[in-house]
Amino acid sequence: MTSVNLSRAPAAIIRRRLQLQPEFHAECSWLKSSSKHAPFTLSCQIRPKQLSQIAELRVTSLDASQASEKDISLVQTPHKVEVNEKIEESIEYVQNLLMTSGDGRISVSPYDTAVIALIKDLKGRDAPQFPSCLEWIAHHQLADGSWGDEFFCIYDRILNTLACVVALKSWNLQSDIIEKGVTYIKENVHKLKGANVEHRTAGFELVVPTFMQMATDLGIQGLPYDHPLIKEIADTKQQRLKEIPKDLVYQMPTNLLYSLEGLGDLEWERLLKLQSGNGSFLTSPSSTAAVLMHTKDEKCLKYIENALKNCDGGAPHTYPVDIFSRLWAIDRLQRLGISRFFQHEIKYFLDHIESVWEETGVFSGRYTKFSDIDDTSMGVRLLKMHGYDVDPNVLKHFKQQDGKFSCYIGQSVESASPMYNLYRAAQLRFPGEEVLEEATKFAFNFLQEMLVKDRLQERWVISDHLFDEIKLGLKMPWYATLPRVEAAYYLDHYAGSGDVWIGKSFYRMPEISNDTYKELAILDFNRCQTQHQLEWIQMQEWYDRCSLSEFGISKRELLRSYFLAAATIFEPERTQERLLWAKTRILSKMITSFVNISGTTLSLDYNFNGLDEIISANEDQGLAGTLLATFHQLLDGFDIYTLHQLKHVWSQWFMKVQQGEGSGGEDAVLLANTLNICAGLNEDVLSNNEYTALSTLTNKICNRLAQIQDNKILQVVDGSIKDKELEQDMQALVKLVLQENGGAVDRNIRHTFLSVSKTFYYDAYHDDETTDLHIFKVLFRPVV
């Protein structure tokens, strides 16, 4: 990994001019002014309308008067060395975590461990088949007498504690522990009344009555058998069982297979035909344990043995979680802005997902005959994004006759997070993918309705910022999202190890919710931001040196151009590309303005010297000379071959401008060509059919987006700009960029066109106040 070299001098400038406080919600001194301005303070809670009034102060606050180009990348400071070492250590930790993922890491479920502990020795001895489960239970009772996650939820605590008490009593072990557990249930059962039903564990109403009956049969004294809430749960179970067709459980894989231990008397042998390839029933250890108790099936036994291997003697609530853990890990790393450190691991993960992909979708673990829209949507999006061939029509399996999408067959109440992942997947749409169009409309409206009610309905995860995450996601579609803007927000939303997942019991997923991910992301974000601030100093110096204000270019416009570059290509080592991006945008505007003002109609061929001729013919030799010097400075330092190509693409662009055919689209293609050439593009590729198609589409898209922005005719429907032709063109561009076709154009080169197009979409979609806020978050707000 390339280290960032920063000198002491610009660091001192930054410290003087960026007096940044660590508290997010306290007043933070954002920028300390230069000598031209009084000290300036901005509250982090500032209203968007105030931001536009700040812009002119902000863009001059980091002035370039004391910095020079050579300051951009010099000696390391001790602090920087320490930061780089921490980053390297974190990267190594995460790499090891990912490459040793195996079946996926997941915390132990007291409930599932207790069910497995009930299994008697299969050879007929009066002993438990899995004594390690009893040992785990005995060693993991909490101080208050309960079992469960540290995040308190009465559903989780009551079920886990009841199951553990029954397991210990079935073997007449640990009477003192049993007594504490019984006391806990008796004293806390009343808390079920008024508890948040969205946090109710999966199958709660099915399995609690079953274990209460088992406790009765074992003669456990003191449990609240007759408590009204316990009776209410039993009544709910009976009502639900009446609604389930009697033979449905035997006919096809449904979510009923997840809670077989709570369904009562079953024809257990008939169920074996629905067994997954790994021996489980819907990846549930407790459900599989129930089948094992009644059938002594060897596959069930082998599955449970495997599930217990890596859980310190206990069992997780589901196993394996190889699909779930891999997909969500990739998603988190991407949104945190640190996926570039783990490209090898991500490819390894996605190769695995592709190898276990089914025509009907995927579930949390491989080898199941069941799928859900959550895992399948995440898989479709990530596979597609990385160039894998995946058919989005797999999502039709989750579409009901009324046009609604459901997480899985039999889901009674839909949750927000699966529908949000469906919405995110549907935004990566290729032409003709109608199911994704339908999914976009349904998911957007479904989520928007929840937001209007100011309350999300969520059954699968407890995350403090899920509401804000979804709200932002609907306001900022993928086309209008820039990588560093996404990372800046997700650093606020990502809870690290604080996220709690809901299954039959609460559980944690260290490959998904991991504090090291966040620590690394914060270190990386701040390191990149420091580099960006130094480059912004250099951009201001360039602005003053080249007298850009005389061409009508404001520092606000300069900042916006640099922000678009830095929010897209943000890596510290890509300084040259960022500065080239920002300066190309500005210089193209300067030249266009100059030519329009000069009113010349001089004809140009592809001779690059035509630009000199136009400028020299102008009466204002001072301004003309400045423009010419600025232009030549942009190209200074490139090798002869690169310079030749740059002159060619700039000449083509200038000819269009001189002939009155300049447009936002032409500017976009110029920018993409300039970036690609400087990245080492072979000249032959410029005339390649695929490259030409990318250029043509980008020109058309960005021209239309520039018109929308200039004419202020933005209309948004279902989260995207309302323009059917523009939408179709964006889909075509996304397909050209993302789909691997074995063509001559490198994937990174193709991505440049999409990146440039997304900045134009961003400009057209977001108003100035929103952009100001994003600039603040990406370039000036520290993350702590």
Swiss-Prot record:
Residue positions binding substrate: R240, R459
InterPro entries, alphabetized: Isoprenoid_synthase_dom_sf, Terpene_synth_N, Terpene_synth_N_sf, Terpene_synthase-like, Terpenoid_cyclase/PrenylTrfase
Location of this chain's protein in the cell: Plastid, Chloroplast
EC number: 4.2.1.133
Practical applications: Escherichia coli expressing SsLPS and SsSCS from Salvia sclarea and CrtE from Pantoea agglomerans can produce sclareol in high-cell-density fermentation conditions, thus being an alternative, sustainable, and cost-efficient route to sclareol and other diterpene analogs.
Positions annotated to bind Mg(2+): D372, D374
Protein keywords: Chloroplast, Lyase, Magnesium, Metal-binding, Plastid, Transit peptide
GO CC aspect terms: chloroplast
Catalytic activity, reaction form: (2E,6E,10E)-geranylgeranyl diphosphate + H2O = 8-hydroxycopalyl diphosphate
GO biological process: diterpenoid biosynthetic process; gibberellin biosynthetic process
Keyword Magnesium in annotation: yes
Its job: Involved in the biosynthesis of labdane-type diterpenoid including sclareol, a diterpene-diol that is used as fragrance and flavoring, and has anticancer effects (able to kill leukemic and colon cancer cells by apoptosis). Sclareol can also be used as synthesis precursor of ambergris substitution fragance products such as ambrox. Terpene synthase that produces 8-hydroxycopalyl diphosphate from geranylgeranyl diphosphate (GGPP).
Name used for this protein in its record: Copal-8-ol diphosphate hydratase TPSSA9, chloroplastic
Gene: LPS
